[in-house]
Amino acid sequence: GIITEITFQAVPAFTLNWKQTIYSDSYIFKTWQDNLWKQAEFVRVWWFPYTRRATIWQASKITQDPNTLPYKPSYYDAALGYHVYHNLLYLAQYIPRILPWVEWFVFGMQYGFRSGPETTIEAVQPSRKALLMNCLYSQYVNEWAIPLHLGPIALRRLSSWLNRLAPSDPDYVEHGIPY
Protein backbone atom coordinates (compact mmCIF):
# COMPACT_ATOMS: atom_id res chain seq x y z
CA GLY A 1 0.00 0.00 0.00
CA ILE A 2 0.85 3.65 -0.18
CA ILE A 3 0.94 5.79 2.94
CA THR A 4 -1.27 8.79 2.30
CA GLU A 5 -1.51 10.32 5.75
CA ILE A 6 0.61 10.43 8.90
CA THR A 7 -0.45 11.74 12.29
CA PHE A 8 2.41 12.80 14.52
CA GLN A 9 1.93 13.68 18.17
CA ALA A 10 4.61 15.35 20.27
CA VAL A 11 4.98 17.16 23.55
CA PRO A 12 6.95 20.34 24.20
CA ALA A 13 10.59 19.84 25.16
CA PHE A 14 11.17 19.20 28.86
CA THR A 15 14.02 18.67 31.31
CA LEU A 16 14.55 15.57 33.44
CA ASN A 17 16.31 15.13 36.75
CA TRP A 18 17.41 11.50 36.69
CA LYS A 19 19.33 9.12 38.88
CA GLN A 20 20.41 5.54 38.53
CA THR A 21 21.42 3.10 41.24
CA ILE A 22 22.71 -0.48 41.14
CA TYR A 23 20.80 -3.11 43.14
CA SER A 24 20.78 -6.88 43.44
CA ASP A 25 18.22 -8.60 41.27
CA SER A 26 16.55 -9.96 44.42
CA TYR A 27 15.83 -6.35 45.46
CA ILE A 28 14.27 -5.71 42.05
CA PHE A 29 12.04 -8.78 42.38
CA LYS A 30 10.95 -7.82 45.92
CA THR A 31 9.97 -4.26 44.97
CA TRP A 32 8.53 -5.05 41.52
CA GLN A 33 4.86 -5.26 42.54
CA ASP A 34 4.92 -2.60 45.26
CA ASN A 35 6.71 0.58 44.33
CA LEU A 36 9.41 -0.11 41.74
CA TRP A 37 7.44 1.36 38.85
CA LYS A 38 5.96 4.21 40.92
CA GLN A 39 9.22 5.79 42.15
CA ALA A 40 9.16 8.47 39.46
CA GLU A 41 7.39 9.50 36.28
CA PHE A 42 9.94 7.60 34.17
CA VAL A 43 11.41 4.31 35.43
CA ARG A 44 13.60 1.79 33.62
CA VAL A 45 15.35 -1.32 34.85
CA TRP A 46 18.41 -2.74 33.14
CA TRP A 47 18.85 -6.36 34.23
CA PHE A 48 22.23 -8.05 33.96
CA PRO A 49 21.57 -11.76 34.52
CA TYR A 50 25.11 -13.07 34.96
CA THR A 51 25.96 -10.51 37.66
CA ARG A 52 22.52 -10.99 39.27
CA ARG A 53 22.23 -7.21 39.52
CA ALA A 54 20.22 -4.47 37.88
CA THR A 55 20.32 -0.74 37.43
CA ILE A 56 17.20 1.24 38.32
CA TRP A 57 16.99 4.46 36.32
CA GLN A 58 14.32 6.93 37.37
CA ALA A 59 13.53 10.47 36.25
CA SER A 60 11.06 13.25 36.87
CA LYS A 61 10.25 16.38 34.91
CA ILE A 62 11.63 19.61 36.35
CA THR A 63 11.80 23.25 35.32
CA GLN A 64 15.47 23.77 36.23
CA ASP A 65 18.16 24.64 33.74
CA PRO A 66 19.85 21.44 32.48
CA ASN A 67 23.23 22.95 33.39
CA THR A 68 22.48 22.83 37.15
CA LEU A 69 23.68 19.23 37.43
CA PRO A 70 25.24 18.18 34.11
CA TYR A 71 25.89 14.54 33.31
CA LYS A 72 29.57 13.64 33.51
CA PRO A 73 30.08 10.41 31.57
CA SER A 74 32.84 8.08 32.67
CA TYR A 75 35.84 7.51 30.45
CA TYR A 76 34.40 4.07 29.69
CA ASP A 77 31.11 5.51 28.38
CA ALA A 78 32.67 6.46 25.03
CA ALA A 79 34.95 5.10 22.30
CA LEU A 80 37.11 3.05 24.70
CA GLY A 81 34.12 1.18 26.14
CA TYR A 82 32.59 0.71 22.72
CA HIS A 83 35.71 -0.90 21.24
CA VAL A 84 36.55 -3.00 24.30
CA TYR A 85 32.98 -4.33 24.45
CA HIS A 86 32.83 -5.07 20.71
CA ASN A 87 36.08 -7.00 20.85
CA LEU A 88 35.04 -8.96 23.93
CA LEU A 89 31.70 -9.87 22.33
CA TYR A 90 33.54 -10.94 19.18
CA LEU A 91 35.85 -13.13 21.26
CA ALA A 92 32.83 -14.60 23.09
CA GLN A 93 31.51 -15.89 19.76
CA TYR A 94 34.45 -18.29 19.74
CA ILE A 95 34.75 -18.81 23.51
CA PRO A 96 31.14 -18.56 24.77
CA ARG A 97 32.00 -19.45 28.37
CA ILE A 98 33.62 -16.00 28.84
CA LEU A 99 30.29 -14.20 28.33
CA PRO A 100 29.46 -14.03 32.08
CA TRP A 101 32.89 -12.51 32.73
CA VAL A 102 32.38 -10.03 29.85
CA GLU A 103 29.08 -8.90 31.40
CA TRP A 104 30.68 -8.55 34.85
CA PHE A 105 33.60 -6.55 33.46
CA VAL A 106 31.64 -4.22 31.18
CA PHE A 107 28.90 -3.68 33.79
CA GLY A 108 31.54 -2.87 36.41
CA MET A 109 33.44 -0.51 34.15
CA GLN A 110 30.32 1.34 33.05
CA TYR A 111 28.22 1.36 36.24
CA GLY A 112 30.54 0.28 39.06
CA PHE A 113 31.41 -2.97 40.79
CA ARG A 114 29.46 -2.30 44.00
CA SER A 115 25.72 -2.21 44.69
CA GLY A 116 23.60 0.13 46.76
CA PRO A 117 22.97 3.85 47.27
CA GLU A 118 26.68 4.73 47.08
CA THR A 119 26.58 3.79 43.39
CA THR A 120 23.96 6.43 42.55
CA ILE A 121 24.69 8.74 39.63
CA GLU A 122 22.45 11.78 39.20
CA ALA A 123 22.11 14.43 36.50
CA VAL A 124 19.79 16.99 34.94
CA GLN A 125 19.44 16.80 31.16
CA PRO A 126 17.05 17.70 28.37
CA SER A 127 14.69 14.77 27.82
CA ARG A 128 16.04 14.20 24.30
CA LYS A 129 19.38 13.22 25.91
CA ALA A 130 18.23 11.76 29.22
CA LEU A 131 15.94 9.20 27.62
CA LEU A 132 18.75 7.74 25.49
CA MET A 133 20.75 4.73 26.67
CA ASN A 134 24.31 3.99 25.64
CA CYS A 135 24.54 0.21 25.25
CA LEU A 136 28.12 0.47 23.96
CA TYR A 137 27.19 -1.51 20.86
CA SER A 138 24.96 -1.27 17.82
CA GLN A 139 21.67 -2.86 18.71
CA TYR A 140 19.90 -5.32 16.50
CA VAL A 141 17.46 -6.87 18.91
CA ASN A 142 14.37 -8.97 18.96
CA GLU A 143 12.10 -7.31 21.48
CA TRP A 144 9.38 -9.18 23.26
CA ALA A 145 6.81 -8.25 25.84
CA ILE A 146 4.91 -9.94 28.63
CA PRO A 147 2.47 -8.48 31.14
CA LEU A 148 4.37 -6.38 33.69
CA HIS A 149 3.15 -8.46 36.65
CA LEU A 150 4.80 -11.57 35.13
CA GLY A 151 8.21 -9.86 34.84
CA PRO A 152 9.76 -11.14 38.08
CA ILE A 153 8.97 -14.80 37.47
CA ALA A 154 10.19 -14.59 33.86
CA LEU A 155 13.46 -12.96 34.93
CA ARG A 156 13.92 -15.36 37.86
CA ARG A 157 13.39 -18.35 35.57
CA LEU A 158 15.91 -16.98 33.09
CA SER A 159 18.36 -16.26 35.91
CA SER A 160 18.02 -19.78 37.33
CA TRP A 161 18.71 -21.23 33.90
CA LEU A 162 21.53 -18.89 32.80
CA ASN A 163 23.36 -19.08 36.13
CA ARG A 164 22.70 -22.81 36.54
CA LEU A 165 21.37 -22.23 40.05
CA ALA A 166 21.03 -25.32 42.19
CA PRO A 167 17.68 -26.07 43.86
CA SER A 168 19.40 -25.33 47.19
CA ASP A 169 20.06 -21.71 46.11
CA PRO A 170 17.53 -19.34 47.78
CA ASP A 171 16.94 -17.59 44.44
CA TYR A 172 16.31 -20.82 42.53
CA VAL A 173 13.01 -21.31 40.72
CA GLU A 174 12.11 -24.18 38.42
CA HIS A 175 12.85 -22.72 34.99
CA GLY A 176 11.38 -25.37 32.71
CA ILE A 177 13.95 -24.62 30.00
CA PRO A 178 14.94 -28.03 28.61
CA TYR A 179 18.60 -27.39 27.82
Language model regions located:
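Noncatalytic alpha-helical scaffold of FAD-dependent oxidoreductases
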Residues: 1-179
